[in-house]
């Protein structure tokens, strides 16, 4: 082999190693930033101090929830993780599962849980895998979580064989609910669902965030991140696909989104609504940012949610 050819091959291999090393670094950085449940998420959410009034209101809602006939319940899922939920006991057979969002936890949904309890529901509020008191190290973006919601539905039926169940989720919880709606194992006792500001898929959401936060295209950064996620978390980001799931759903669904949402962009709700099989309704809340629809116009929000659920339970 000529010396010049060897030099060219050597340079090419060196560049390939550098590129692969860079992609490996980028993939691991993304995994740590977005999927590792224990890492700092301030790059995504910023370091703004929370409004003291909002913090106090959240504490008050939690205390109100725990002052009801509320207990901690536990379930071991098919992957061996011990999962936690709050269960608000009441009379009757009308149940609702309330699902929190990304890096949140069950206790942060206390305001919603209290509302449904006041409407006569028996309420189950799970900590999703790797959140709150539930075990796990990686955030599932709905891929795993939707399977856990199916199992929580079966848990309810063990407590109450005559149960009629609704699903309600916000943000990642909304996408989890949508993914669960298309799961063939979802019990027939689940009658209706409400999704508030869910994303079409984890892939689409992270593509948006890569561009919004870093000005990067999805290829090759997200492909590298997905490779690392498959290695370290054991799932493919493309499996967290709410858009594919709603095409197969067999239950009515109310889609809600704020028209000022710049975290899960409002444009995501339209293909979800269009693709959804079966009975469906769409509510766009003017001026509402991500997860803020019920704060911007609480009367209209709860009137719509309650009336929609009431048609099927």
What kind of feature is each model-predicted range?
Residues 179-235:
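Hydrolase active-site cap/lid region
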Residues 18-76:
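An N-terminal hydrophobic leader/cap segment in hydrolases
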Residues 248-250, 255-257, 261:
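Short beta-strand/loop motif that positions the catalytic acidic residue
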Residues 273-291:
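Catalytic histidine neighborhood in serine/cysteine hydrolases
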Residues 102-115:
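The serine-hydrolase catalytic nucleophile loop
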Residues 139-160:
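Alpha/beta-hydrolase active-site loop
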Residues 113-135:
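Conserved alpha/beta-hydrolase
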Residues 296-313:
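Catalytic active-site module of serine/aspartate enzymes centered on a nucleophile-bearing elbow/loop
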């Amino acid at each position: 082999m000529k010396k010049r050819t060897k030099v060219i091959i050597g340079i090419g291999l060196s560049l390939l190693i550098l590129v692969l090393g860079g992609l490996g670094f980028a993939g691991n950085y993304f995994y740590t930033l977005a999927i590792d449940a224990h890492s700092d998420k301030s790059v995504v959410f910023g370091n703004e101090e929370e409004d003291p009034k909002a913090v106090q209101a959240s504490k008050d809602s939690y205390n109100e929830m725990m002052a009801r006939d509320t207990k901690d319940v536990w379930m071991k899922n098919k992957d061996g993780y011990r999962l936690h939920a709050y269960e608000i006991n009441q009379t009757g057979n009308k149940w609702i599962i309330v699902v929190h969002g990304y890096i949140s936890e069950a206790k942060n949904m206390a305001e919603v849980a209290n509302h449904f309890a006041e409407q006569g529901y028996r309420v189950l509020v799970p900590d999703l895998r790797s959140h709150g008191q539930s075990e796990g190290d990686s955030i599932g973006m709905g891929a795993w979580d939707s399977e856990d919601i199916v199992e929580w539905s079966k848990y309810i039926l063990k407590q109450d064989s005559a149960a009629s169940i609704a699903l309600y989720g916000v943000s990642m919880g909304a996408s989890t609910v949508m993914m669960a709606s298309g799961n063939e194992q979802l019990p027939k006792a689940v009658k209706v669902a409400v999704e508030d500001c869910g994303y079409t898929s984890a892939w689409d959401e992270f593509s948006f965030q890569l561009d919004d936060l870093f000005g990067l295209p999805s290829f090759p950064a997200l492909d590298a991140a997905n490779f690392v996620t498959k290695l370290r978390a054991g799932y493919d980001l493309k499996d967290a696909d709410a858009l594919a799931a709603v095409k197969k759903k067999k239950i009515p669904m109310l889609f809600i989104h704020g028209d000022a949402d710049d975290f899960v962009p409002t444009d995501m709700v339209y293909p979800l609504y269009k693709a959804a099989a079966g009975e469906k309704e769409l509510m766009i809340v003017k001026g509402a940012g991500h997860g803020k629809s019920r704060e911007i116009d609480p009367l209209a929000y709860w009137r719509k949610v309650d009336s929609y659920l009431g048609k099927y339970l």
